[in-house]
């Protein structure tokens, strides 16, 4: 680790030890596991994240691009507060979902309709199912080394390198986690 990485005696290290007693590996997402311990965030503003030890980082990840407008943007905060006052997470349809779909379809020429999902993983699962139905083919391709959520058939070859790529006409599929189905590598 670099000299700026929080030390083993840091607050991040303490939180990691504490978290391991109630959360596997001490964090709620496997994508943030870093050895010897993850960096725990205290707060963020704009493009900058500050950890629990007071170290400041430029956030180039932006929660895997879901925070493209930056953290704690005043306009976003205002819109969220306004919606909170009206209620959230209805299990019924709302006009706002139609308004957002119309806005997106108007701005993206190739988009005729849109389906909203609860997570990127759920969106990938739906996209794979739709692709299989449309093409009537069982196999899919995926960007090598890229993260596409935690769905079994997308959570593969995340840590690949030239030593395990396989042949150009027969690439290797490397399961990312234990419990991946055997069909993943068939």
Show which residues each predicted segment covers.
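Active-site-adjacent loop/helix segments that line or gate small-molecule/cofactor pockets in enzymes
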Residues: 2-43
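Electropositive phosphate-/nucleotide-binding environments in soluble metabolic enzymes
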Residues: 9, 13, 43, 70, ...
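Short, hydrophobic/aliphatic alpha-helical segments
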Residues: 10-18, 48-55, 105-106
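Glycine-rich, flexible loop/turn motifs
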Residues: 23, 29-30, 37, 63-65, ...
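Active-site and channel-lining beta-strand-loop segments
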Residues: 38-61
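Short beta-strand-to-turn element immediately C-terminal to the catalytic PLP-Schiff-base lysine
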Residues: 50, 69-70, 156-157
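Glycine-rich loop-to-alpha-helix module at the N-terminal edge of alpha/beta enzyme cores
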Residues: 56-137, 141
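PLP-dependent aspartate aminotransferase-fold enzymes
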Residues: 102-186
